[in-house]
């Protein structure tokens, strides 16, 4: 049985710029106006990343547009947002992030079947320029293959 996900935002650059080694799911602490803005699909996680702050993990650089009808109770668009994880998961993440070259990148943000906002995080290692070129070559080759198959 497939799990229901209503995707709000995706980070397609992360898959191109990083080797994703492990994928995790985390809840996120939001204000009411942020949830309303997310329901309208007004969010961007293109340059967002997560980092530890002591014994907690926060999501940085996640842009959630201000909700128009919230007036003075509105939120800051790029404020750090706390991620909800189990203690074991936090320790595991912090251990892997502290290794040189690894980072925690937001891959997607979505509503699950209970209408809770979840963030899909990836423990990632940065790609070098030649790795990116190899990825582009693979994509081009797959496109050429599909064209050749369609022509026959």
Curated annotation (Swiss-Prot):
InterPro entries: SmpB, SsrA-bd_prot, SsrA-bd_prot_CS. It is found in: Cytoplasm. GO terms for cellular component: cytosol. GO terms for biological process: trans-translation. GO terms for molecular function: RNA binding. Keywords: Cytoplasm, RNA-binding. It comes from the Bacteria. Required for rescue of stalled ribosomes mediated by trans-translation. Binds to transfer-messenger RNA (tmRNA), required for stable association of tmRNA with ribosomes. tmRNA and SmpB together mimic tRNA shape, replacing the anticodon stem-loop with SmpB. tmRNA is encoded by the ssrA gene; the 2 termini fold to resemble tRNA(Ala) and it encodes a 'tag peptide', a short internal open reading frame. During trans-translation Ala-aminoacylated tmRNA acts like a tRNA, entering the A-site of stalled ribosomes, displacing the stalled mRNA. NCBIfam families: PRK05422.1, smpB. Belongs to the SmpB family. PANTHER family: SSRA-BINDING PROTEIN (PTHR30308:SF2), TMRNA-BINDING COMPONENT OF TRANS-TRANSLATION TAGGING COMPLEX (PTHR30308). HAMAP family: SmpB. This is SsrA-binding protein. It comes from Rickettsia typhi (strain ATCC VR-144 / Wilmington). The lineage of its organism: Bacteria, Pseudomonadati, Pseudomonadota, Alphaproteobacteria, Rickettsiales.
């Amino acid at each position: 049985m497939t799990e229901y996900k209503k995707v709000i935002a995706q980070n397609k650059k992360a898959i191109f710029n990083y080797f994703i080694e492990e994928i995790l799911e985390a809840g996120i602490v939001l204000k009411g106006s942020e949830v309303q803005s997310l329901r309208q699909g007004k969010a961007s996680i293109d340059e967002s990343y997560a980092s530890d702050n002591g014994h907690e993990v926060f999501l940085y650089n996640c842009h959630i547009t201000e909700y128009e009808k919230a007036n003075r109770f509105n939120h800051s668009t790029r404020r750090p947002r706390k991620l909800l994880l189990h203690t074991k998961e936090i320790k595991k993440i912090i251990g892997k992030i502290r290794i040189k070259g690894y980072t925690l990148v937001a891959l997607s943000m979505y509503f699950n079947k209970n209408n809770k906002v979840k963030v899909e995080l990836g423990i990632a290692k940065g790609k070098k320029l030649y790795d990116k070129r190899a990825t582009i070559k693979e994509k081009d080759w797959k496109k050429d293959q599909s064209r050749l198959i369609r022509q026959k």
